[in-house]
């Protein structure tokens, strides 16, 4: 969007920023007065956007005043919102950029200047999603080698060595199988422990480069080859369209880094300042609210509308204030706190609302904590969870490499418009729809087990709870061990040393990151605890099967850049590769002596892991008690060697000089954790990321793309085609034409989803899309999915209503078929629609309640339009989909209350005629006449003048295109 809308009625409140006279901004706090001062921070962002983008048509003065009157208007009015930018994924980016390329073509053909066609706001498109795997990563790469001996070495390419941390000695011969020389994979117990991500990592024992498996490199090459055409189109887009940046594949950015790298927090466009805000098709879009950036996920057609300069519309939401107080327990990890907060929010019924955090406890949460909470909105149903910018945010941005001068301007601006939150409790907090109070001190760390993940046990009750499990009858928790046998000890000889096993002994300890990727600080906490333990002289018994599975390159970066990997290794937590190896039970077998001792003494041995599943016997058939715990607690229980320990009163073990070491002595404080995270990890991570972004990658840099302002469409392409949305584009829209003698293409029931309308999965071999691709010379293996072919309107039109579960009442059973009434033939939906179009017969759709349920999907509106559908007549609609129909030029009509096809005696075999008056008005009624002589009234579901204008123009694409003529 433009920083300054020409002709805005609010230009008199534009001011210069104090101490920065060259910087200007809308001082919305002066306009709003005391009403503004009590608005939630998130609503203040909506208000500023409405003031800055007010043009009297798309955004009216009444919209701005409705937002200012949020307290009385919440839930009652619809308001427009013009986000500052858009984030797209490759799947949703293809159709959006294809539409822009087609619009340029149409504008040129209609006599306009195609170079003027550009996204109206900054648009970032990430091309970092693997679409297909050609070479298996071997799901059991960590399984035991039953044949024994040396496993065959795969050909591998070495990752570059980033640095040489201080070497620490190995635990002993049992856990070290020889030197990890260049070109050789590290082995433990005869298994490969190779990474499966393109991220440099060192062998944790010998600090040598770990190779990348050949399969990864092959997959990357195959993926690049398969997607070359689309990648060339993206590269062309980045060259010719203003406001467009493409994040190329293999950049290796996790969602958090990706979103933070793209985030501005405050926009500075030609010295005009305004808050950052975003909508995106990525499900992780809400994560940016943890940085004080208002944003949420929408469908592809909504993001495209924003790119076209249109606002998104939302019902002015309730805002739930979440007050955080108290101090977190020392043993509570970030994940404990995050899960504790999300649990409270689930119980608070915040679905469909904004959540905003305030209170003294907010400053205890790092930005990683905040973004994780914000990212978990789907867990508790909120639209977003907003953390206003504060000193913690600024400190984080400083460590990510934000320019200091920009930070100073940012802080001054946010304070000027009252969008900056002070750490201390303010005398005047915003007024919220409701307040949920959460005391951080009430969040107690738990473990789950011993058999089911839903059986949670407070860590301080663990010893007594395990004792209860021994006593209870065999069942969901109990083991029914006789009282006289509960203190049995079984001696065992292992590697020349004598050990004792008893009930509760830990024999498997696995630090797994599959549930911790969005907040790697808990993995860092495990590493810092390991460091302190090693420095204190603590060890892990060698018979305990320990392992470390980082889960992602981001977690590896946390562990390696902070220098804790060698300490984890010293305790036996050796990297076993990326992937949930221990989660799915692929751990190395326990030593035979240990297995025999457990079975001989009928010992209830324990596994402790930080995964998600702990079913009995999952890790090993002789390990009957399995607990899920946070990564640092996994390390702590491994050191203790038993779960029958009270961490408050009993030491983990004996350190140097015979000193008893308690958990509190080595547990990292939250301050320590945040300091290491911000100063060591975050700063180096963003430095590396920016270098990678500036350098690009070899394949992307060498990729050739056209230089012309118009895209040279390849008529042979099966991925990218110029769509026909603009075929009738002229400077002025044609007057509304009646829909005369329309046949019903489909007669559908209730709850028809967008997936019924436009499936995203694989292309069935018998489908119309498959026939088209076969005629283009493709084999079934090359069909790919509908999602991958969203840039080809011919495939997507043929895929419309191609879901095999579609229930058309004309057919009577689930099938993507319908009847072509003039001929009486039963055909594929596309074939019937094609015949109707050749005959010049318009078609409509009859449907029941909740038409268009499910995820927003652009082709669920575009597809029916290209099939020739002029109107949908339903009992009710999913709101977003109804707006999408208008946005593409299809009339959404609704039966009057109490009426439906059955009550009106409609069979769907009639022909329907719909007359439009010369002037449409919001929510007006229209008359429909059938070929049988029946006349009935329906609502035309146009909510406002904007929707009527879009419909008259044939949809938003044509409406915007006409602006360039």
From Swiss-Prot:
Cofactor needs: [4Fe-4S] cluster
Coarse class of the protein's main subcellular location: cytoplasm
Keywords for this protein: 4Fe-4S, Cytoplasm, Iron, Iron-sulfur, Metal-binding, Phosphoprotein, RNA-binding, Ubl conjugation
GO cellular component terms given for this protein: cytosol
SS bond partners: none
Function of the molecule: RNA-binding protein that binds to iron-responsive elements (IRES), which are stem-loop structures found in the 5'-UTR of ferritin, and delta aminolevulinic acid synthase mRNAs, and in the 3'-UTR of transferrin receptor mRNA. Binding to the IRE element in ferritin results in the repression of its mRNA translation. Binding of the protein to the transferrin receptor mRNA inhibits the degradation of this otherwise rapidly degraded mRNA.
Molecular function in Gene Ontology: 4 iron, 4 sulfur cluster binding; aconitate hydratase activity; iron-responsive element binding; metal ion binding
Taxonomic lineage of the native organism: Eukaryota, Metazoa, Chordata, Craniata, Vertebrata
Source species, domain of life: Eukaryota
PROSITE patterns, alphabetized: ACONITASE_1, ACONITASE_2
Region annotation Disordered: where it falls in the sequence: 142-170
Signal sequence segment: none
Subcellular location: Cytoplasm
GO BP annotation list: intracellular iron ion homeostasis
Protein name: Iron-responsive element-binding protein 2
Family: Belongs to the aconitase/IPM isomerase family.
Cofactor binding annotation: Binds 1 [4Fe-4S] cluster per subunit. [4Fe-4S]-binding affects RNA-binding activity, thereby inhibiting activity of the protein.
InterPro entries: AcnA_IRP_Swivel, Acnase/IPM_dHydase_lsu_aba_1/3, Acoase/IPM_deHydtase_lsu_aba, Aconitase/3IPM_dehydase_swvl, Aconitase/IRP2, Aconitase_4Fe-4S_BS, Aconitase_4Fe-4S_dom, AconitaseA/IPMdHydase_ssu_swvl
Binding site for [4Fe-4S] cluster: 514, 580, 583
PTM annotation: Ubiquitinated and degraded by the proteasome in presence of high level of iron and oxygen.
Gene3D superfamilies (alphabetical): 6.10.190.10, Aconitase, domain 3, Aconitase, domain 4
């Amino acid at each position: 969007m433009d920083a300054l809308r020409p002709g805005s009625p609010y230009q008199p409140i534009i001011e210069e920023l104090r101490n920065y006279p060259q910087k200007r901004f809308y001082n919305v706090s002066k306009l709003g007065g005391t009403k503004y001062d009590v608005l939630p921070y998130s609503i203040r962002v909506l208000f500023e956007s409405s003031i800055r983008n007010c043009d009297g048509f798309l955004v009216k003065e009444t919209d701005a005043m409705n937002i200012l009157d949020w307290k009385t208007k919440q839930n009652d009015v619809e308001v427009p919102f013009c986000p500052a930018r858009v984030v797209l994924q490759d799947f949703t980016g293809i159709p959006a950029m294809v539409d822009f390329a087609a619009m340029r073509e149409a504008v040129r053909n209609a006599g306009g200047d195609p170079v003027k066609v550009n996204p109206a706001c900054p648009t970032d498109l990430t091309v970092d999603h693997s679409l297909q795997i050609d070479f298996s990563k071997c799901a059991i790469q960590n399984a035991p080698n039953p044949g024994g001996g040396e496993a065959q070495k795969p050909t591998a390419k070495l990752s570059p060595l980033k640095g040489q941390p201080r070497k620490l000695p190995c635990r002993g011969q049992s856990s070290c199988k020889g030197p990890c020389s260049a070109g050789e994979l590290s082995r433990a117990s005869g298994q490969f422990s190779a990474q499966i991500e393109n991220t440099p990592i060192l062998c944790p024992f010998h600090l040598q480069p770990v190779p990348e498996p050949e399969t990864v490199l092959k997959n990357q090459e195959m993926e690049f080859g398969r997607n070359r055409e689309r990648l060339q189109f993206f590269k062309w887009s980045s060259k010719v369209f203003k406001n467009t940046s493409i994040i190329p594949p293999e950049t290796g950015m996790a969602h958090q880094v990706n979103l933070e790298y793209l985030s501005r927090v405050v926009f500075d466009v030609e010295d005009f300042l305004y808050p950052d805000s975003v909508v995106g098709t990525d499900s992780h879009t809400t994560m940016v609210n943890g940085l004080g950036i208002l944003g949420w996920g929408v469908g592809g057609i909504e993001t495209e509308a924003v790119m076209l300069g249109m606002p998104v519309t939302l019902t002015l939401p309730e805002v739930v204030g979440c007050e955080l107080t108290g101090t977190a327990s020392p043993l509570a990890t970030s994940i404990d706190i995050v899960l504790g907060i999300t649990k409270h929010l689930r119980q608070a019924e915040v679905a469909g609302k904004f959540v905003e955090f305030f209170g003294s406890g907010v400053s205890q949460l790092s930005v990683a904590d905040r973004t994780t909470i914000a990212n978990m909105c789907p867990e508790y149903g909120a639209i977003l969870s907003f953390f206003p910018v504060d000193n913690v945010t600024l400190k984080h941005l400083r460590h990510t490499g934000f320019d200091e001068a920009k930070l100073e301007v940012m802080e001054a601006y946010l304070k000027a418009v009252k969008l900056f939150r002070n750490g201390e409790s303010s005398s005047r907090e915003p007024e919220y729809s409701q307040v949920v109070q959460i005391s951080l001190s009430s969040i107690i760390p738990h473990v789950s087990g011993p058999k089911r993940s839903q059986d949670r046990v407070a860590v301080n009750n663990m010893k007594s709870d395990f004792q209860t499990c021994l006593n209870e009858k065999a069942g969901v928790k109990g083991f029914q061990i006789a009282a006289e046998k509960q203190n049995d000890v079984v001696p065992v000889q292992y590697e020349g040393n004598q050990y004792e096993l008893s009930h509760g002994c830990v024999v498997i300890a696995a630090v797994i990151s599959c549930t911790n990727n969005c907040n790697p600080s808990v993995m860092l906490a495990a590493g810092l605890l390991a460091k302190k333990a090693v420095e204190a002289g603590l060890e892990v018994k060698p018979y305990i099967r320990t392992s470390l599975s980082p889960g992602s390159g981001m977690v590896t970066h946390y562990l390696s850049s902070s220098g804790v990997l060698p300490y984890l290794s010293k305790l036996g937590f050796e990297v076993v590769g990326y992937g949930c190896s221990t989660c799915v039970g692929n751990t190395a077998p326990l030593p035979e002596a240990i297995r025999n001792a457990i079975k001989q003494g009928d010992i209830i041995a324990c596994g402790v892991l930080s995964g998600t599943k702990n079913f009995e016997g999952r890790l090993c058939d002789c390990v009957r008690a399995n607990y899920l715990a946070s990564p640092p607690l996994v390390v702590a229980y491994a050191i203790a060697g038993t779960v029958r320990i009270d961490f408050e009163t009993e030491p983990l073990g004996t350190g140097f000089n015979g000193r008893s070491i308690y958990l509190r002595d080595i547990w990292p404080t939250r301050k320590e954790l945040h300091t290491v995270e911000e100063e060591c990890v975050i700063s180096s991570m963003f430095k590396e990321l920016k270098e990678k972004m500036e350098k690009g990658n070899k394949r992307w840099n060498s990729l050739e793309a056209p230089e012309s302002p118009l895209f040279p469409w390849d008529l042979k392409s099966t991925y990218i085609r110029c769509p026909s949305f603009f075929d009738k584009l002229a400077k002025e829209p044609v007057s509304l034409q009646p829909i005369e003698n329309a046949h019903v293409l489909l007669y559908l029931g209730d709850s028809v989803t967008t997936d019924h309308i436009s499936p995203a999965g694989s292309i069935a071999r018998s489908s119309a899309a498959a026939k088209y691709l076969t005629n283009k010379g493709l084999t079934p293996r090359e069909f790919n999915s509908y999602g991958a072919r969203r840039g080809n309107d011919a495939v997507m039109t043929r895929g419309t209503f191609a879901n095999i579960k579609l229930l058309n009442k004309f057919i009577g059973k689930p099938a993507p078929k319908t009847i072509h009434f003039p001929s009486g033939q039963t055909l594929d939906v596309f074939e019937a629609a094609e015949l109707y179009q050749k005959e010049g017969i318009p078609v409509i759709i009859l449907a029941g309640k909740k038409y268009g349920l499910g995820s927003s999907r652009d082709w669920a509106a575009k597809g029916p339009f290209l099939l020739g559908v002029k109107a949908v007549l339903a009992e009710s609609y999913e709101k977003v989909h109804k707006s999408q129909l208008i946005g593409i030029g299809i009339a959404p009509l609704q039966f009057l209350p109490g009426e439906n096809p059955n009550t009106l005696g409609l069979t769907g075999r009639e022909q329907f005629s719909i007359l439009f008056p010369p002037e449409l008005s919001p929510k007006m009624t229209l008359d429909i006449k059938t070929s049988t002589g029946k006349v009935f009234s329906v609502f035309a579901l146009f909510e406002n003048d904007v929707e009527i204008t879009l419909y008259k123009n044939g949809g938003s694409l044509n409406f915007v295109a006409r602006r360039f003529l």
